[in-house]
Every structure is written in C-alpha cells, then in structure tokens.
C-alpha cells in the first residue's frame, strides 16, 4: 500500500526517499517504509539501518526562527520529518533545565506519556496510518510500548504490545488504559512472535525485527526534533550525553545537528556521548572492536530500559562522526545521578539518569560550549516504584521516628 491512502494531516514533508546507512548510494522510494533494515547492504552478520532523505534545498528559511503563532512540537518541524499522517498528542517542546553553570538537562519526562519515545511514535504510527495498516505491533516492556499504545489509540489503530511479566506498574497501567493487547512472553520469544503477527495480521511493526538493531526507517527522524529544540534555545552545545540502548536516540539527535550544518545554520555538531550500563555495552564494544554492530553478554542491572545485548550501526555512526565517545556507567553512578536530579526537582527513571551519570564520569574537559544531558523518562517508569518505608503507616505519636526520618 502507498501513502496515497491517507493524506498527511500536518505540514508539507520534504522527505524524498530512503537510503542505506551501510552504503548511502543505495536508495529506495519513500514508501513503503522499510522496517527490517536495508535489503541490499545487510549481511548475515550485520543488518544495516535505513534513514530518510530530504529536499534540503527547499527547507523554509524561517523554520528555525521563532515567530508568533508558530506551531509547536512535531508540527513545527514537519518539513524535516516523514509525512505526519497520524494526529499528535503535544509531543516535544520539553524544557532545558539548568543544572549548574554550563550544564543543562533536557527533561523528556514532560512528553505526553512521560518519555522521549513519544517523539518516535508520532512518526512510526504516522507511517502505519500512511501505509493503510489496521494496527501496530511493538516488542517492549517499557516506555516504547506505553507510548506506542497511546499514539495508536489516538490514530484509531489496534495495538499489540509484546512484553514480559516484569512490566513496571505505570507502564502496565498505560497499556491497559489505552486498550492495547498485552502479550507477556519470554524475552527470547518476543521477536519471532512479532514477526509472525506482522505476517499473519498485516500489522505495522514499530520496533525492531532484525538480529542486529535496525528499527523502523522513519523512527529516529522523530528524535531529530530534540536537536532542533536545543539549537533554537542554546545554539550548538559542546556535547550531548544520552542514555543509550539500541542507539536510535543517539543517532536521531546527531542527525538533527548534522542537518543544521548541511543547511548552513551551524558550523559543527556537538560531540555525542553514549551512556550504557556497564553490565553490557554493545555500542562501546562495537566501537572498541571497529565493527558495525556486535552482541555482548549482559549482566544484571536495574536500568532495564537501556539494557541490551545487541546494538546497531546507527550509534556507531553518531559517535564516530561527532568525535564523541562511548561511556559505561554503573548502577551506583546512575543512582547518584538520579539523586542529583531529584535534588534539583527532576524525578527521573534510573535509565534516564545515565546521561548525567556519563557526564559526571567523564567530566567537562575539552568540551567546547555548554553540555546537555538528556533525561529520557519519569521516575514513575521504574519497576521498583514504592519503598517499604514510604508505604507503611507511621504512628504520629512516635516522635523519635518522625525526627529520625526528618534528619536522615
């Protein structure tokens, strides 16, 4: 099916086609969206992602200049996004919160479902609508599934979420409120089941289906809007530190800044730093070994949202092309960063604090300009949400205990 089935509801996209990251000379039409990587350059060992190309020479000159009555969120950036066939929920436009001199937190918990995933799902659900699909399917036990369910409901599509028995309470509540079909299965069974649902029902996959991560061709385009927002408020920072699982967010933010350079609005991109749990780190391993993507053993971590055994080529491109680096952070470092954010009034999921943890680990040496740490999600999304002390009733006459808690 083609995009003619449903016209875009917002703005005029300047997207012209798709191209392989493995070999940018390999190009494809814009439709249908390639959801399993590049069919030409991918090999048995590495699946290469596909990205979207645009008619950059036609980008409106005032796109990055503030003006009265300007649309907000994805609507503002429609020329540099794939066609927005599905309605939005007010995604984007999240605040940059100062945290000390020269350090800023991009707080993505202010999005409609409290995470950065709303930026990607506005785009992928739009692709599903444009392709004429009756539903979407996603493999996720966290933010991605919750967000996909919301945007599917908004677009009038069915949503199947293939998750696990350990879904955080807030995410589970999201899924059921939005009417998603939730299928908890063992992790190893997620992706074979997803592919079968795609084949049998014709649902549009909005998460990964390949052995090394490629994800949805249109998805990371939604993350570019983070770069646009940072640029319009701060200019080009010296560095951006991001929690990293598969590397889609990392790539999307890098590409947004790279587009600003291509448009003549910036003279450089910030250095991009991936921040992965030290119990795994497939991107750090791929960069260390000089390979496009790799698989690593994964140990236990509470940062479930970014714990991954396999990475993708997108992250390698972003770090390499920006002169950045791949950092590994421990749970203790993420806990300390989360506590620092909380003292500043920002409640972050443990995984979301990985960016600040990475910055604290590396320091600001040789970083030219302000630093932005992206905090991806709300503390409501953590699995271990309630403490035993907080949920137990306190005897108001037990002044010693009252005093102990206040002084702790």
Predicted regions and their residues:
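PLP-dependent amino-acid enzyme catalytic core
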Residues: 2-408
């Amino acid at each position: 099916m083609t995009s003619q089935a449903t016209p875009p509801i917002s703005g005029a996209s300047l997207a012209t086609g798709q191209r392989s990251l493995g070999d940018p000379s390999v190009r494809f039409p814009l439709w249908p969206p390639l959801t399993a990587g590049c069919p030409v350059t991918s090999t048995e060992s590495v699946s290469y992602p596909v990205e979207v190309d645009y008619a950059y020479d036609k980008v409106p000159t005032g796109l990055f200049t503030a003006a009265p009555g300007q649309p907000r969120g994805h609507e503002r950036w429609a020329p540099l996004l794939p066609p927005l066939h599905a309605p939005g929920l007010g995604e984007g436009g999240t605040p940059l919160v100062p945290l000390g001199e020269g350090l800023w937190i991009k707080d993505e918990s202010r999005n409609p479902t409290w995470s950065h995933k709303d930026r990607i799902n506005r785009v992928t659900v739009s692709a599903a609508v444009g392709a004429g699909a009756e539903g979407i399917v996603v493999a996720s036990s966290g933010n991605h599934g919750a967000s996909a369910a919301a945007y599917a409901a908004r677009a009038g599509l069915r949503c199947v979420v293939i998750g696990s028995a350990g879904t955080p309470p807030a995410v589970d509540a999201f899924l059921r409120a939005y009417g998603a079909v939730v299928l908890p299965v063992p992790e190893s069974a997620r992706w074979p089941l997803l592919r079968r649902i795609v084949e049998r029902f014709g649902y549009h996959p909005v998460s990964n289906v390949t052995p090394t991560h490629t994800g949805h061709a249109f998805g990371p385009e939604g993350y570019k809007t983070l770069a646009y927002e940072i640029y319009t408020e701060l200019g080009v920072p010296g560095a951006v530190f991001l929690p990293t699982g598969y590397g889609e967010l990392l790539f999307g933010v890098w590409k947004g800044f790279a587009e600003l350079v291509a448009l003549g609005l910036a003279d450089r991109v910030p250095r991009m730093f991936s921040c992965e749990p030290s119990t795994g780190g497939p991107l750090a391993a791929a960069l260390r070994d000089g390979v496009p993507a790799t698989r690593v053993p994964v140990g236990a971590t509470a940062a479930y949202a970014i714990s991954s055994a396999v990475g993708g080529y997108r992250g390698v491109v972003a770090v390499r092309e920006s002169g950045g680096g791949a950092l590994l952070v421990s749970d203790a470092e993420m806990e300390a960063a989360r506590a620092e954010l909380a003292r500043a009034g920002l409640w972050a999921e443990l995984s979301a604090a990985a960016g600040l943890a990475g910055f604290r680990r590396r320091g600001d040496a040789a970083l030219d300009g302000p630093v932005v740490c992206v905090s991806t999600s709300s503390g409501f999304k953590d699995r271990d949400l309630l403490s035993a002390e907080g949920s137990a009733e306190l005897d108001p006459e037990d002044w010693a205990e009252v005093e102990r808690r206040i002084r702790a």
